[in-house]
């Protein structure tokens, strides 16, 4: 199971792991962590902001919804192409679903371009991301060709069904989303732990100072014979 799950990684995981591991090392030697900006946008660069956006939990949810929507569009296209619904719908309906599907694929193409710009070579370290990108590009090319040649789907219909395999992206998106949320919670807990450790250290220091003050006052009272020494 662990051998399979290691392929369900998303771009940005490596960077976050390195930064959080470095923070763990620094906590042992420096003051506890304060509330700091997200690691990806700490540099205030466009690439950093884009990394944060593409790795965020909300963006993963949007991708999951679009994948489900795209799968539904493809399913309707297949049913229409097989003429299972031909008598029940107008002839323009297939074109509408086809262009809707292309619109969703265009968003996925932009997502891939954004990831390539933001993460560069790190993108190719994640096999599932590369496989997903290949399916998107192939599907987009087929859809563009299909606009001008309606008969091409009869010859390569099985290729467009590859897009239904993108449902696996839902599984990947859920795993990445849950993992990201868990890592963010763990990161916040580490920050809270650091803050609490700092407060404990301050309280211990105050207690030590109070004990010293009590000892000094006790000694002063003894010197003035307020009460005998024990």
From Swiss-Prot:
InterPro entries from the UniProt entry: Hvcn1, Ion_trans_dom, Volt_channel_dom_sf
GO cellular component entries: monoatomic ion channel complex; plasma membrane
GO BP terms: cellular response to pH; cellular response to zinc ion; proton transmembrane transport
Membrane topology: Multi-pass membrane protein
Keyword Transport: yes
Tagged with keyword Transmembrane: yes
Cytoplasmic face of the membrane: 1-58, 120-127, 177-230
Protein keywords: Cell membrane, Coiled coil, Ion channel, Ion transport, Membrane, Transmembrane, Transmembrane helix, Transport, Voltage-gated channel
Compartment(s): Membrane; Cell membrane
GO terms assigned for molecular function: voltage-gated proton channel activity
Coiled coil regions in record: 178-225
Main location: membrane
TM segment ranges: 59-79, 97-119, 128-148, 156-176
Topological domain ranges for the Extracellular compartment: 80-96, 149-155
Free-text function comment from the UniProt entry: Mediates the voltage-dependent proton permeability of excitable membranes. Forms a proton-selective channel through which protons may pass in accordance with their electrochemical gradient.
Family recorded in the similarity comment: Belongs to the hydrogen channel family.
Quaternary structure (record): Homodimer.
UniProt free text on domains: The segment S4 is probably the voltage-sensor and is characterized by a series of positively charged amino acids at every third position. Unlike other voltage-gated ion channels it lacks the pore domain. The C-terminal coiled coil region mediates homodimerization. It is essential for normal subcellular localization.
Protein name stated in the entry: Voltage-gated hydrogen channel 1
């Amino acid at each position: 199971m662990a051998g399979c799950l290691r392929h369900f990684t998303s771009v940005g995981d490596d960077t976050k792991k390195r930064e959080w591991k470095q923070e763990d090392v620094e906590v042992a030697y420096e003051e506890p962590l304060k509330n700091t900006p997200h690691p990806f946008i700490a540099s205030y660069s466009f690439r950093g902001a884009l990394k944060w956006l593409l790795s965020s939990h909300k963006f993963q949810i949007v991708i999951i919804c679009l994948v489900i929507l795209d799968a539904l569009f493809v399913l309707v296209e297949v049913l229409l192409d097989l003429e299972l619904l031909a008598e029940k719908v107008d002839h323009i309906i297939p074109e509408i679903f086809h262009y809707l599907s292309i619109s969703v694929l265009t968003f996925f193409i932009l997502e891939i371009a954004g990831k390539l710009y933001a993460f560069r070579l790190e993108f190719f370290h994640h096999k599932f991301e590369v496989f997903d990108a290949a399916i998107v590009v192939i599907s987009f090319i087929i859809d563009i060709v299909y606009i001008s040649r309606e008969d091409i789907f009869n010859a390569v219909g099985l290729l467009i069904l590859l897009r239904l395999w993108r449902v696996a992206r839902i599984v990947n998106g859920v795993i990445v989303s849950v993992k990201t949320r868990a890592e963010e919670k763990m990161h916040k807990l580490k920050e809270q732990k650091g803050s609490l450790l700092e407060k404990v250290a301050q309280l211990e220091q105050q207690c030590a100072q109070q004990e010293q003050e009590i000892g000094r006052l006790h000694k002063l009272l003894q010197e003035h014979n307020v009460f005998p020494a024990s």
